[in-house]
Curated annotation (Swiss-Prot):
Keywords: Capsid protein, Helical capsid protein, Host nucleus, Host-virus interaction, Ribonucleoprotein, RNA-binding, Viral nucleoprotein, Viral penetration into host nucleus, Virion, Virus entry into host cell. The gene is NP. InterPro entries: Flu_NP. Residues 1-21 are annotated as: Disordered. Encapsidates the negative strand viral RNA, protecting it from nucleases. The encapsidated genomic RNA is termed the ribonucleoprotein (RNP) and serves as template for transcription and replication. The RNP needs to be localized in the host nucleus to start an infectious cycle, but is too large to diffuse through the nuclear pore complex. NP comprises at least 2 nuclear localization signals that are responsible for the active RNP import into the nucleus through cellular importin alpha/beta pathway. GO terms for molecular function: RNA binding; structural molecule activity. A motif (Bipartite nuclear localization signal) lies at residues 198-216. Late in virus-infected cells, may be cleaved from a 56-kDa protein to a 53-kDa protein by a cellular caspase. This cleavage might be a marker for the onset of apoptosis in infected cells or have a specific function in virus host interaction. GO terms for cellular component: helical viral capsid; host cell; host cell nucleus; ribonucleoprotein complex; viral nucleocapsid. Its main location: virion. It comes from Influenza A virus (strain A/Equine/Jillin/1/1989 H3N8). Disulfide bonds: none annotated. This is Nucleoprotein. It is found in: Virion; Host nucleus.
Amino acid sequence: MASQGTKRSYEQMETGGERQNATEIRASVGRMVGGIGRFYIQMCTELKLGDHEGRLIQNSITIERMVLSAFDERRNKYLEEHPSAGKDPKKTGGPIYRRRDGKWMRELILYDKEEIRRIWRQANNGEDATAGLTHLMIWHSNLNDATYQRTRALVRTGMDPRMCSLMQGSTLPRRSGAAGAAVKGVGTMVMELIRMIKRGINDRNFWRGENGRRTRIAYERMCNILKGKFQTAAQRAMMDQVRESRNPGNAEIEDLIFLARSALILRGSVAHKSCLPACVYGLAVASGYDFEREGYSLVGIDPFRLLQNSQVFSLIRPNENPAHKSQLVWMACHSAAFEDLRVSSFIRGTRMVPRGKLSTRGVQIASNENMETMDSNTLELRSKYWAIRTRSGGNTNKQRASAGQISVQPTFSVQRNLPFERATIMAAFTGNTEGRTSDMRTEIIRMMESARPEDASFQGRGVFELSDEKATNPIVPSFDMSNEGSYFFGDNAEEYDN
């Protein structure tokens, strides 16, 4: 990235900090996850959860959602102004699962939001600790990315289901800040912008008046975030055009869809962070681990090491495969929903299957599901190796535009060849190169056509033994060229729709 000097590292975004050196970053990220852990322990005490119950990922998710809801100011304000039947704007809650007489029981709990906020602040030295909240949002987003497909959302905005590997972070709330923006895929940003432009087309007052001015600022900011993800001058120039448009309309939507397609080959840079469920941090804090003193990083060995020594349980439905449930959660923990399965399998040390072959549904249990038949299992979240998380997009050659893997947005900085069928993608680019962006379009298409699939991405980068915490001996895996490793192959997952 040419602009590396002006960028803050993810951890600085994550902790809202200004420039810090590596030790300070590790300490502030440690403080953040330590606060999450302390909060979780306190909530388990409040709810009188036993050890097994506190390690249940479904309970962790309920507790995480409660604190996110307690701090969702915009929604809280909305709920107070639009009282709806049966919703107390001052309360939050969800299902808590308890073990009773050898069976799992569901109990719906309700808490004052004020009380939850107090417990959260107390666990975070009296601060609001928004970084910790964002961290939980990203964990939920990563879980959604691994669990659901967004075909319907893609089609609704005029995009193509084949662009699913660009959709990281598509369920992140707007309020997720800089750390959230860093993990959003190109497709996610394009979709947010298209929705905005469509509102402007349908509502004449959208860009007008005092409100419209704020809307315009948000629009330009989103354009700049997306521009920053692109790595070639032509793609960025096209984003400038979209941003500067007097009155954004269908021409801009066309440009954005073109850019999203181009990102299938000329990948954008999208950050990846291993965000773990709150109960994992809780377990570590409870066992006496001092995150702030030891320091912590979301992109190095630390999350792998934490998962090696954490036992987390999950409820399993009668016909689900526990190994598949574990794969789903492992992918969510490492933000690997869009990674090449060959790479993930190598790191995890077990062969991972595409989503179409998984015998498991989502982690969360709907309120109408029968608890009688529910069992619980240990999730296998350990790995054989660890690898550094990347944000590069995996283009093979930084100097000239070059190819990244088509149906993959790399998570790990590990060398892989690029099996890709360029013809299928290029077919999407027939026709329209007129209009004001024609020269940029022509340039982008030229770059894509000259991209060579035989190069390897992340040349010389490898995985590391779990004992190699300083990353001194990279082990460069060799992969079978023949099978492209997209997780979405033969996809039949449920849609994510709130």
